[in-house]
A protein has these predicted regions:
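Active-site-proximal beta-strand elements of phosphoester/diester hydrolases
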Residues: 1-15, 106-116, 148-150, 205-210, ...
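Active-site neighborhood of phospho(di)ester-bond hydrolases with catalytic His/Asp-centered motifs
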Residues: 5-7, 43-49, 73-79, 113, ...
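Binuclear metal-dependent phosphoesterase catalytic core
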Residues: 23, 178, 196-279
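Acidic/histidine-rich helix-loop elements
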Residues: 5-28, 83-93, 117-127, 164, ...
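Active-site environment of divalent metal-dependent phosphoester hydrolases
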Residues: 12-15, 52-57, 79-86, 117-122, ...
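N-terminal active-site segment of His-dependent metallophosphoesterases
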Residues: 1-60
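Active-site-proximal segments of metal-dependent phosphoesterases and phosphodiesterases across multiple
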Residues: 17, 142-186
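Extended active-site neighborhood of metal-dependent phosphoesterases/phosphodiesterases
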Residues: 56-136, 141, 174-177, 181-184, ...
Length: 279
């Protein structure tokens, strides 16, 4: 099974009065999303902040691009996706579920909603008690089958910057009380902090993707019989490289991070399933 995963995309509205901005926006995202969809996979996954403010026009624009190929696309909500509209309205437009799981032959896939609704002061993550108890049931039911979790916010004090204020699911929420019940291997994918990072703790591997605007790349996740292989694939087309500086200069609610790219150890890894089975 192969999964294609991308970090924060921040597809955004533009001001037509600013020369070249709309054209650069269209060229960047048409190229980037085209390369994302070009990759063959069983699921194509966004880790949230698919849009920059969650307006109806942003959602229509990005989903229009995503709909140009026949792919199974799953969108985990990010805080930026819920600024302009309420959660229910966003989900009505996208047709996505708030949180859910998919049980496959190779692994259990879990998609969380860690975003607060229209909270302009606190962009940190939150998981309510109902969702936490639901997740606990999914973890328990998965047994020793590998579990891959996809969420926007990291778990507190795991990947880089997850210890910062508003940089993770709130520290008062004991995610380990649920994740710690997992038998076998778990892999947790997230975005939000705009920096590449991989952290291993207990039987979990935490894989954090930087924003697509900063590091023009996706992750290829292959779930095999004996391991999970996570590889980075850069997008180096001119439509992306030449357009990005214009977006940095004009788009609101986003600050370019020139230090987003990590080393190889922050972007790629292999998670053994054999060792977990033997243990």
């Amino acid at each position: 099974m192969r999964l294609i995963v991308m970090g924060d995309l921040h597809y955004h509205d533009t001001d037509a009065a600013i020369a070249g901005w709309t054209e650069a926006r269209d060229r960047f995202y048409e190229t980037m999303i085209g390369k994302f969809l070009e990759e063959e996979g069983d699921f194509h996954i966004s880790l949230g902040d698919l849009t920059n403010y969650g307006t109806a026009t942003e959602l229509a624009g990005v989903y229009g691009l995503l709909g140009q190929a026949s792919r199974t696309f799953v969108h985990a909500l990010g805080n930026h996706d819920l600024y302009a509209q309420k959660r229910a309205d966003v989900l009505a437009i996208t047709g996505q579920k708030r949180y859910h799981s998919i049980d496959t032959e190779r692994a259990t896939l879990v998609f969380l909603d860690t975003a607060k609704e229209q909270d302009f002061e606190d962009w940190g993550g939150w998981v309510d008690e109902e969702q936490l108890r639901w997740l606990e049931g999914v973890v328990q039911a998965s047994g020793a089958k590998p579990m891959l979790v996809f969420a926007h916010h990291p778990v507190y004090r795991t990947t880089k910057r997850s210890e910062m204020d508003k940089g993770s699911i709130h520290h008062s929420i004991d995610m380990w009380s649920v994740l710690g019940q997992k038998q076998g291997v778990g892999v947790y994918f997230n975005g939000h902090t705009h920096v590449d990072s991989i952290h291993r703790e207990r039987n979990w591997t935490f894989v954090q993707l930087s924003a697509v605007l900063d590091q023009h790349a996706v992750r290829l996740v292959d779930v095999e019989s004996d391991c999970i292989r996570i590889a980075a694939k850069d997008v180096e087309e001119a439509g992306v490289l030449e357009s990005a500086p214009t977006l940095y200069a004009h788009m609101p609610h986003f600050r370019h991070n020139p230090e987003a790219r990590g080393g190889a150890e922050d972007r790629e890894c292999v998670v053994s399933l054999t060792a977990a089975t033997q243990a």
